[in-house]
């Protein structure tokens, strides 16, 4: 658990705030996130998290994220030379999910841990949906995408389970602290999707004809930003990326998430697991990207998400 969260939990035990010496809160808190966080429906169900669909457009057809496998993104690109366009969860999408939550959990508080507001309108659309609903909804911009957002959601869900006395405001403050200590980056196997996509800030500066060039795409203040470059095989890149990120952000060693898009070779997965063990990580978990981030990373991408001490 994050040390900074202990301060939040102490606040929850202050007079009038619930916690020690007072009954648990009677109103349930329900967590919400977008499908772009790449939690599977099964994992989200285990955590008690409701998922709101983002969208992917291929030509004139727009489909909900999660309703088809990401391999179809690759097939569309191979066929057309165009990367599918991603779009936010709409106001209607949030209204539908908020209504479902209210019908199953009357009077519940809703805490929405949002996909980065700098990259999509989902956060704004959730605010609009909440304003017209009359429900108790708190939206928090995690300033993360994909597995970075998932890591924040997972930690917040664990915190809520362990401390049901938390108010939505305290849980939201805790989620912001978690997000500030969460660091995500990934490395595409090739540059094709970055060239065709255009969603990554300053990506053009890293695109060249050099073979085996792998730009590291990190999340900075909610935006995807191209940073340092790696050369060589993805096996070597994966090992170096783990070492570099663990050192740069002083990662806690209790948990490290691995990001993989479809097509990542098994030898890269094994190398990553071996490197994580040698760096002292106690647990690792692989998360397969969904359609939204796959549109940016392409096939065979590898990344990590960790937590600063």
Range-by-range predicted roles:
Residues 98, 102, 114-117, 130-137, ...:
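Generic hydrophobic/packing signal
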Residues 29-95:
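N-terminal glycine-rich anion-binding loop in soluble enzyme alpha/beta folds
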Residues 33, 114, 260:
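Short beta-strand/turn micro-motifs composed of small residues
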Residues 58, 62-63, 70-75, 98, ...:
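Broad hydrophobic/π-residue packing in well-ordered secondary structure
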Residues 1-9, 80-84:
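Short, basic, glycine/proline-bearing loop/turn elements
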Residues 93-123:
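N-terminal glycine-rich phosphate/adenylate-binding segment common to multiple enzyme folds
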Residues 3-4, 10-27, 36-50, 55, ...:
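Mixed-charge interfacial surface used for oligomerization/domain docking
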């Amino acid at each position: 658990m994050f040390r900074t969260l202990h301060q939040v939990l102490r606040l929850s035990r202050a007079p009038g705030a619930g916690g020690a010496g007072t009954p648990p809160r009677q109103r349930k808190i329900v967590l919400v996130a977008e499908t772009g966080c790449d939690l599977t429906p099964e994992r989200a169900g285990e955590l008690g998290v409701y998922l709101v669909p983002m969208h992917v457009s291929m030509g004139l057809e727009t489909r909900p994220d999660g309703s088809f496998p990401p391999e179809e993104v690759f097939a569309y690109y191979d066929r057309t030379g165009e990367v599918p366009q991603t779009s936010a969860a709409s106001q209607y999408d949030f209204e539908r999910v908020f209504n479902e939550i209210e019908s199953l959990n009357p009077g519940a508080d809703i805490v929405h841990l949002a996909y980065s507001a700098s990259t999509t309108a989902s956060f704004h659309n959730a605010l609009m949906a909440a304003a017209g609903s009359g429900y108790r909804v708190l939206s928090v911009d995690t300033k993360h995408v994909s597995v970075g957002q998932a890591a924040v959601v997972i930690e917040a869900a664990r915190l809520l389970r362990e401390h049901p006395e938390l108010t939505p405001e305290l849980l939201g403050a805790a989620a912001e602290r978690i997000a500030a200590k969460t660091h995500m980056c990934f490395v595409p196997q090739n540059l094709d999707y970055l060239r065709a996509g255009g969603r990554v800030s300053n990506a053009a500066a890293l695109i060249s004809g050099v073979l085996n060039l792998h730009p590291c795409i990190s999340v900075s203040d909610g935006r995807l930003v191209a940073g340092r470059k790696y050369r060589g095989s993805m096996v070597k890149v994966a090992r170096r990326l783990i070492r570099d990120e663990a050192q740069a952000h002083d990662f806690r060693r209790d948990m490290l998430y691995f990001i993989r898009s479809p097509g990542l070779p098994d030898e890269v997965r094994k190398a990553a697991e071996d490197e994580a063990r040698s760096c002292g990580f106690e647990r690792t978990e692989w998360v397969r990207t969904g359609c939204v981030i796959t549109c940016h990373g392409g096939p065979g991408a590898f990344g990590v998400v960790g937590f600063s001490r």
